[in-house]
Amino acid sequence: MSTNLTTLDSLTKNVYLPGLPNWVNLRRPLYGRLEKVTKKQRFRGRKFIFAAQDGLPQGGGGIAESETLPTAGHTSVVNMELAMKYHYYVARLSAQVMDAASSDVGAFADAVKTELNGIRNQLEEDLAVNGLFGDGSGAIAEVASYSSATLTLKTQPVVGQNGSRNLRKNMYVQSWAGKSGGTVQADHRLISAIPSTSTATVPTSAGFVANDYVFRSVGAGVDPRNKVVMGLRGIVDDGGVVDSFQNLSRTTNPSLKCNVLGNSGTLRAWTPDLMDEAAMESALNGGGKSPSAIYSPIEIQRRAAAYLRTDRTYDMSIKTLDGGYKGVTWTTPDKQIPWFWDRYCIPNRVDFVCEEDLFLAIQQDVGFADNDGRMWRYTDRKDEVEAWLRTWRNLGARACNNHTSLRDISHTL
C-alpha cells in the first residue's frame, strides 16, 4: 500500500486562513440618518414630559356696531409623556477563552473584541428594527404557521409583513397572541437557522400558533412586550396601531393622528399621482408643515424607478443629500423631498415624514455600564466575566399630523 493522506493523517497539518469574515448584513443607513437629523433631548429623571398647543383662543367673530364684544377664548394646551425604554445587551466570556483567543496565534480573532463588537452591532440593529419597523410593542414578525421545527412567518404579499427579515440566527424569541395581555405561547425558543425569507428553524414542539406575534426574548418567563423604543409604525399612525400615544388618546386628540392615504388593505400599484397626493396631504389636511423626507422599503423605490424610466418628465437621478447620503428626490410644488430606503422600513408603505417634529429623548447614550469604574464584572462565583452594553432612550414626536402615510402599495409592478 502506498503512503497517502490517509496513512499520514496524523502527520499533516491543516492550514487556516487568517481573520474572521462577517456574514451578517449590518447595513442600516436610515436609522443612522434618523439619529443624526432628529433633535436630541438629554435629561435626568424618570420620564420626559412636554407640552403642545392643540387649540387657538377662539374668542372672536363679526359683530354689528355697538354690539357686545365676543366672549374671550383660551389657548388649549396638553401635556404628553414619553417614558424611557431600557435596552441592554450582555457579553459573557470565561477566563480561559479570553486567554486562549487573545492573539492570532491561538484564534482567528480576539474573542473579547469579537463579542463586544457583536453586542454593539446587535444593539444598533435592534434600535433600527424597532425604530423603523416597530410600533413600540417589540413585535418583529407574525406567525403564518408552525410545523415540526419550521416556523413560517407572514410575508409578502400579506400587507405590512416582512417575513423572517427581522429575525436572526442565535436569537431567542417568544410568541404571544397579542401585543399586550394574554399568555405566552412559545417561551424563549432558540432560532438555529434562517433558511429563507419566510422561515426560521426552531425546536420541535416549540408551541408557536398561527397569527401569534413574535418578540425578541430576554429570558424564559420574562414578558418582553412594550419595553422597546417607539418606532415609525406607532408615530406615523392614525390610531389604527397605537391608540394611546405618549399618554394621550388619539381619538380625543386628533392632532396626534397622521394623515393616511390607504386602500382598505388591498394592495395597489405605485403611481406618481399617489406620490404627489401624499406629498401635499400634510399641507392640505394636516398641521401645515411639509414632510422633509420620504421613507420606504427598497422594493417600492425599485418599482418607482422601473415605472419612471420611460417617463422623462420625472427626475430619479441619484443625488448627494444632507450628511453625504446618496438617494433620489421627489419634486413637489413646495420643494424637493429626499427619498430614502431601508430594509427595515414598513412593507407596503411610503411614509412622508416631517423629521422636524421627531425627537430622541436620551437618558443614557450607548455605552458600557461602568458606574463603579469597571466594565467587566464577575458573576455567579465562576471564573467568567460579563460586560453590559446599554442605552436608555425613546423616540417621540411633538406632533403627528405633519406626517403622511401612503399605504397598501404593492412591492411588484
Model segments located where?
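Short, charged, low-hydrophobicity "junction" segments
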Residues: 63-65
